[in-house]
Amino acid sequence: MLVKVFGAAVQGIDALVVTIEVNCSQGIRFFMVGLPDAAVKESHERIVSAVEHNGYRFPRKQVIVNMSPADIRKEGAAYDLPLAVGILASDEKIEAGKLSEYMLMGELSLDGSILPIKGALPIAIKAREEGFKGLIIPKANVREAAVVNHLDVYGVENITEVIRFLNGEIELEPTVIDTRAEFFREYTHFDLDFSDVKGQESVKRAFEVAAAGGHNIILIGPPGAGKSMMAKRLPSILPPLTLQEALETTKIHSVAGRMERGSSLLSQRPFRSPHHTISSVALVGGGAFPQPGEISLAHNGVLFLDELPEFSRQVLEVMRQPLEDRKITIARAKYSIEYPAGVMLVASMNPCPCGYYNHPEKECICSPGTIQRYLGKISGPLLDRIDIQVEIVPVPFEKISDTRPSESSESIRRRVIAAREIQAARFADYPGIHCNAQMTTRLLNRFAVPDEAGLKRLKDAMNRFHLSARAYDRILKVARTIADLEGSEGVQVQHINEAVNYRNLDRENWGDR
């Protein structure tokens, strides 16, 4: 008997429907075609054990399985459940009437338990788009998939539940989640707050500007000055995720298998902080079986690279294009995969190997050549892509011992949100542009033209610091953000002055770059 069962294959952060055709006939062999990988081919042994452990008999017949479309590689053990159901239905152990209404995915253990899978959310979205009545998946993934409305999502723990449900012997209750309530439940809660930071008012201001315009930022300063402390508090002043951004971010983490068990929707912007020993593939994604990298896992959030010069040159250079394009394209011989990479890059570094160059109290023991080699690990093109470059100095004792509360993240966030609302109105007619950091040269010429005094100041800075054309654009973008924070319609000289001050690594005292 020929039957069809439906599953899904995840490519990038989206899913494709996979049709699994099973035919049982006279014979004793097991054939599987349709570009399955080794894990899918090995499912035969798992399915036999799971089925017979639960009191059912695996057919002693010739079983032919075809997985289409044949040009899409089927990877992983998540096809165990639809394969098992298809084989039993073909052997008339399961009624085939309901099979066309449901999509099934799940990995089987030898005792028939159904184990978690990756990509439950994009699979659920695809099931709804294709008009399936419901989705049957592992119970551990059910809340993740149930955020998709207008789809019955059933979480199951073992194969017996699935067989009895499809045969009409039991009823299963679909898991229902109020997506909006789930989204708003924790999206304003933060454990870290800028009120914990003593002093460093100028650096806090730089973070406010970065958050308001979506600008990349790098902090240069000695050990213990508070670089990491402030970077970790950046998400607390960023605008909250929209529901659409939350779904997109959750899809990426779902595909990567990074969702916590029982979680549903990511309601806060991600903060990723990879170690400096990370490989280029782990950072940008890829591999034999392509997966999102850290830069994609930080999409719609913050990617923090602590001690930037300690990262390998290859890792830093491979990051340049994604920062510009806000996406990662992984090309293979027969297909290509695209992952989003819309991140705010926050980096920190010491000014020299010993850490005390330009320190007000401690003496630097590094030679000028050593300092230049250290700074030379970060290329000019990469620095050009970092809009705000801030030098940070140690906090004096008087500030550390001050018990008066500092400004909270909430009050800073209100100003950031107000500036973002101005930008949202400005770019309403420009799809794909949401904040000042994303402006093209054409938009800069329309929205960020400085006044006469500002233009003169900018010309002086370009000549003095030998800035590139890209750095020129970055200064204008930052100046436009500063003007938005002040509610100014035009870009004025004081906005240009502050923006130029955020190009510390272009200054003469950091050497010619």
Outline where the language-model segments fall:
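Walker A/P-loop
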Residues: L219-E260
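The Walker A (P-loop) glycine that initiates the GxxxxGKT/S ATP-binding motif of P-loop NTPases
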Residues: G221, G285, E307
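Short beta-strand elements
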Residues: V18-C24, L283, D387-V390
